From Swiss-Prot:
InterPro entries: EGF_Ca-bd_CS, Kinase-like_dom_sf, Prot_kinase_dom, Ser/Thr_kinase_AS, WAK, WAK-like, WAK_GUB. Glycans are attached at N61, N123, N143, N250, N275, N303. The modification Phosphothreonine is found at T607, T612. The active site is at D573. The gene is WAKL9. GO terms for cellular component: membrane. It comes from the Eukaryota. This is Wall-associated receptor kinase-like 9. The modification Phosphotyrosine is found at Y520, Y620. The EGF-like region is specific to this family of proteins and seems to consist of the C-terminal of an EGF-like domain fused to the N-terminal of another one. The chain crosses the membrane at residues 373-393.
Amino acid sequence: MSSYNSFSLWILFSLQLCFILDSADRTVSLCQPDCGGIKIPYPFGMGKGCYLEKWYEITCNTSTSGKLVPYLSVINKEVVGISLPTEGRGSRYNNPYQSVNIKNPIASKECSSNGEELGSLLNLTGTPFYVSQHNELVAVGCNNTASLTNVKPSIVQCTSSCSTKPHTHIKDYLAVLNCQNYNGYEKNCNEDSSMDESIMDETSCNGIGCCNAYMRGGSIQQIVGVTIENTITRGCKVAFLTNKAEYLSNKSDPQKLHARGYSTVELGWFIHTTNHSFIKSLGCYSVKEYNNERYTSTQRRINITSCICDDNAYLSYARCSCTRGFQGNPYRLGGCKDINECKEEEGMTYCGTNKCVNLQGHFKCVYNNHRPLAIGLGASFGSLIFVVGIYLLYKFIKKQRKLNQKKKFFKRNGGLLLQQQLISTVGMVEKTIVFSSRELEKATENFSSNRILGQGGQGTVYKGMLVDGRIVAVKKSKVVDEDKLEEFINEVVILSQINHRNIVKLLGCCLETKVPVLVYEFIPNGNLFEHLHDEFDENIMATWNIRLRIAIDIAGALSYLHSSASSPIYHRDVKSTNIMLDEKYRAKVSDFGTSRTVTVDHTHLTTVVSGTVGYMDPEYFQSSQFTDKSDVYSFGVVLVELITGEKSISFLRSQENRTLATYFILAMKENKLFDIIDARIRDGCMLSQVTATAKVARKCLNLKGRKRPSMREVSMELDSIRMPCGDMQLQECVSENEEGEEQNKGLVEDIMRAESRSKEFVTAPASHYNNIAAASSSSWSDVEPLFPLQTR
């Protein structure tokens, strides 16, 4: 009977044990593997029965934003990652690498408006966790001195400054910056001896606004604090311990780091237990057993176990890791799995072109006959070199042809003559820049259509940006007259000498293209015509003072061209579309495509008639003799445009008043100046100034050139008008001197007949006029011929 009872008890005990083991396996399999996307490997776990001991318990909480966040319960810190020891981390068997990354508050000073100062202390006493040596002390802010506490005998400290030279102090009981510290006594050292100023950049943390110091020594630190010393320097300062120091630099903002509030700290961990039954249940070798078996075995390369454990009974902790050739979780029975080294991962192969055979915890390579492969590779490589050589030869020949073509164009376009001219003018004028075609192609995106500012009958203007950041206008002609290249080069040299704030500057040219290309400074605010007639920006032209200033700027520029430049220059196409407005709405005279230079002993040029209807001097139209007074007449028309806001040619006016000059002269003669003043300025202008300006315009529009004032006189008179003066009666604005009107009647009739036949632009006798309507609305980028017409 007793034997029967004993047998029954034994069966009952066996069934109970099986039930317990089955329940344990089932519980582990039902454990939640992650929290908020962060994997939770054993011995850590969430829920009862899912973690080894209370130290490794993870709670999965819900944040205010609704996301799941894991916390390490024993220290109540948010977890951002848990790692297990792996062979690939380069760890030694007696010190396997395993860590927990947590969020830890940072220390700050003078970063909040209420003056609150925050400290940072991490206390891990009594837990199986310690502060990893992979962490660094980081201090950010000007003249910020930070240090770690509770790390004796070491002194870990650094100082950041905002001077031009770094002063980073890292004190350690080992060796930092050639310093040695033994038992608290510090030797003299040169702090700069190990500094490399070449690494002082914005991507490193080397003492300029940011410094760092490494934790050193082999002792396990479980209480670490961060303090910031008091300094006289004001401003936000932060300091913290982190394993992510590589993401900080001298440009790091302490205020942003303070607002973030935390840093990532790496903690090392081990199995905290005095009962080693768990370690033994894993079936792992101890380090001593592993070394003895491995180095006494005849097959030393083959691992005899998948995991090893460092079981230190004296310190009451143990750490395990998978051996070489295995990977996985060493804290689970059979958790270390064989690595298939023969499987290509990330492009890495162990045997190269040979056959790879996977073994348990190892692999071997079966070598092949490489001769056929070598022959094939040699043939392929030779063919590749041949093809590449042919391609490079083709590219070289193509480049040489292009270079020779550029040289040919440069010589044909007068490049040698330009070089001689530049040599002869050294020290006298600013050197003209000769741009390469490659520079201009890059500046205009290979003359992209998206860069076009405007097009005309003779060429196109592109907007470009040079390598130095300057914005320029690149003028590319469509045609070239090789007979006039010498004259063109002379014009380029002379125009490049012009240095006046109210004249668009010619920056240089390019002669390596089929036709020469001119480069001008870029004027951003369009031309005067757009602002006066197209309501481009009505507010700018709504005041008389702006218009008077523009008139004075134009007069000063033309006066400079006629009398102040090294050789007098006649513009020959003064009109509102050729008056540019810069960013301050100051006038700049542009488009010298038809300009002519004259010697000081000549008073006029005899040329083929060229100009724009409505602005052209009637006397020049009949005689083909262009003088400085011809520019005066054209300026007079622009002056009337500023006063009246009317276009130089308008089909909305009567036949006899179709040209603005005739319309204005008749209004002055009938004493109706007030009626033709632009309505936008009529109420707010000084009538005395408008009247005086109208008198100047009337003088400029005299049909006889000898009775017109010079541009210098016009400029001086407009300057005097701008001076404060009393109001004048409107009737005084009408000039009583109409001398020569009857004698010039025949001239006026000829002009009127020419206008009835014309369409826009005169480049030949009157029978070749083009469209007038197009002339009255053309933009500033209307391109005139790059090469001046032949003088006679």
